[in-house]
Amino acid sequence: MRTLRVADLEAKPGEKVSGFVHIIGAEFGIPVTLICGEKEGETVLISGGVHNAEYVGIQAAMQLADELDPKKIAGNIIVIRLMNRTGFEHRTMSLTYEDGKNLNRVFPGNPNGTLSDRIAYTVVTEFFPKADYYVDLHCGDGSVSYTHLTL
């Protein structure tokens, strides 16, 4: 029987499991949902919150994780609900709070680097090998001027 595993999280066919994947040297993990479809198929990795102030991507990732039914899915879906957790909690726009780095620019990361480097390293080593496809959700954030879009 095929089981979807990422770090310490595990979902069997027809199951949805949520939890946290630990970041090396951090006291927290990143929130993740594993959706293991009842039927065989490929695996899609979806991430929200690489840029912590891109709220639409974060909300979309959370809604997808909550609403998708594993009994109606062929293959697997891995959802990183919020990759840059501390940046989100401290409202630092698009940077990681602890090191001031743009998480999207440090991939593939470094297990001995700053928090941003270690988050990127965890995603590259724990998530990427499981995925056939990767969708990284982005949108405008607080630094975008919406005046030209307003009637």
Residue ranges, per PLM feature:
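Structured catalytic-domain cores with a bias toward divalent-metal coordination
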Residues: M1-L151
